[in-house]
UniProtKB/Swiss-Prot annotation:
Necessary for the introduction of cis unsaturation into fatty acids. Catalyzes the dehydration of (3R)-3-hydroxydecanoyl-ACP to E-(2)-decenoyl-ACP and then its isomerization to Z-(3)-decenoyl-ACP. Can catalyze the dehydratase reaction for beta-hydroxyacyl-ACPs with saturated chain lengths up to 16:0, being most active on intermediate chain length. It comes from the Bacteria. One of its GO terms (biological process) is unsaturated fatty acid biosynthetic process. Signal peptide: none annotated. It comes from Salmonella typhimurium (strain LT2 / SGSC1412 / ATCC 700720). The keyword Kinase does not apply. Its EC number is 4.2.1.59, 5.3.3.14. InterPro entries: FabA (IPR010083), FabA_FabZ (IPR013114), HotDog_dom_sf (IPR029069). The keyword Lyase applies. This is 3-hydroxydecanoyl-[acyl-carrier-protein] dehydratase. Homodimer. GO terms for cellular component: cytoplasm. PANTHER family: 3-HYDROXYACYL-[ACYL-CARRIER-PROTEIN] DEHYDRATASE, 3-HYDROXYDECANOYL-[ACYL-CARRIER-PROTEIN] DEHYDRATASE.
C-alpha cells in the first residue's frame, strides 16, 4: 500500500531512501548527501502547467552544506547539476507516489537553462515539477518540466525531464 499524502517531511524522505515509504519494490530517493530536498510541500495528481500532476519541494540552504566547501574554494556555489538531479529525484518520487514499482533511473532532459545561482547566503531553494505525461506500461516513465527557485526567484528551468522505473537494471 502506497503512503499517498500531499506532503512529506525530511524523515519521510529519509524513509524513502531506506525503501520504507513506497514498499520493497517501490523507487527510493537517494540518502544524504545526495538527497537534495528537506520536504515535499505539495503533491497532486492534477494541477501544474499541464494539469497532469504537480510536485513542490524545498531545500533549506545554509553555508555548511557539503558542496559549498568544494565548489568552488573562495567562490562557493551550489552545483547546477545538483538542482537538476533534485528534479529527477522528484519525478521518480512522484512515480512511486502513484504506485509505480522499480528502480528509478534518470533517462534524460530535453533542455536546461541556468539563469541564476544558489549561494551560501540564500535561505531556501524551491523545486516545482509540472507533469506532462505518465507512461504506465512495461516501462513506467514520467515526463515533466521543472523549475528551481532560490528565495522566490526563478534560476533554472528544465524541459522534458524523463525518469523511468525498471524492474531489472542489469542491462541498463
Amino acid at each position: 500500500m502506497v503512503d499517498k499524502r500531499e506532503s512529506y517531511t525530511k524523515e519521510d524522505l529519509l524513509a524513502s531512501g531506506r525503501g520504507e515509504l513506497f514498499g520493497a519494490k517501490g523507487p527510493q530517493l537517494p540518502a544524504p548527501n545526495m538527497l537534495m530536498m528537506d520536504r515535499v510541500v505539495k503533491m497532486t495528481e492534477t494541477g501544474g502547467n499541464f494539469d497532469k500532476g504537480y510536485v513542490e519541494a524545498e531545500l533549506d540552504i545554509n553555508p555548511d552544506l557539503w558542496f559549498f566547501g568544494c565548489h568552488f574554494i573562495g567562490d562557493p556555489v551550489m552545483p547546477g547539476c545538483l538542482g537538476l538531479d533534485a528534479m529527477w529525484q522528484l519525478v521518480g518520487f512522484y512515480l512511486g507516489w502513484l504506485g509505480g514499482e522499480g528502480k528509478g533511473r534518470a533517462l534524460g532532459v530535453g533542455e536546461v537553462k541556468f539563469t541564476g545561482q544558489v549561494l551560501p547566503t540564500a535561505r531556501k531553494v524551491t523545486y516545482r515539477i509540472h507533469f506532462k505525461r505518465i507512461v504506465n506500461r512495461r516501462l513506467i516513465m514520467g515526463l515533466a518540466d521543472g523549475e528551481v527557485l532560490v528565495d522566490g526567484r526563478l534560476i533554472y528551468t528544465a524541459h522534458d525531464l524523463k525518469v523511468g522505473l525498471f524492474q531489472d537494471t542489469s542491462a541498463f
